[in-house]
Structure formats: C-alpha cells, structure tokens
Amino acid sequence: MGEEGSFVAPGWVLDGQGRLMRELKPHMGRRLPDFDYSQRRIYEITIVLEDRRPILGRLVKRGEGDWAVEPSEIGGIVLACWREITVRWPQVELIEDQLMPEHFHGVLFVKEQLPKGKSLGNIIGSFKSRSTSEVGKYLAARGGGQNPARGGVLSKQLII
C-alpha cells in the first residue's frame, strides 16, 4: 500500500521495477516461486471474477438436494473460451470445468513439456484475454455495458 504522502492509491503498489500494479491479496500468492509451470502434469485452476460479481450464471434447483449452475450468456462465452484452449495449446488436455456464479474452476493436463519460454501462466493468460475480448464483443453488440478490457470481467490476478 502507498505510504502517507505517496501518489500510490490504497490497494495499489509499485513492483520492483516501479510499475503500478494491484496489491495481491493473501490468497493470490499460491504459485510456488521456483516451480516449473511448463512441465507435464495436471493443474487445478480457479479464476475469480473481479469484485466477485455473480455474472457467470445462477444456481438452480434440479431436484431434491440437487443444485446446478445455469450459465448466463457471459458464462457460456467463458466456458466456450476455456474449451477452445486446446486449439492454441495442443500440448494441453482439458479434464474438467465447473462454472460458478462468480468464479470458475478448471482442471487441465499439460501432456508434454510446453515450448521454451511458455508456461501455465501463458495458457491461462490467453484464456482470460480471449474471454474478456469475447465478452466485450457480446456486450458491445447488446448496446453497451462495461468494457471488460477496461474494468476486467475476469480478475486481473490469476489465482492458482
């Protein structure tokens, strides 16, 4: 957080190179610092919407004690973008996904070592970027709404 008299607003920090970034919350530092996230293994991903806005779907009762999430239009776009990951990343197999009103869970298998310089962060970053872009197109076609590229439909921070 910015010090008294600092130009940095609360909730924002300067990184080691002087760039402004959102302050990480305690639950956002779950990556292992020296771990190779390009290696062959199964990864469980959770991505939370900024401000936990419940815009991906709604809980509906299917039967006695049986509930499900019915995706909204935006939730459907996010699911479609997730399921297209393998088009750009043939080294990846999608195992499972679960949409919740304000967050998303996915399990993926990196079947083979990713190309040099690429990691799980690149895969998830491209998914979030594409989702935000596609949701932005959807909102623009409907005559407005917040531009997700500016306000961020998907959280700016990856939670792993």
Question: What is the predicted function of each stretch?
Answer:
Residues 1-160:
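Short catalytic/metal-binding and nucleic-acid-binding patches
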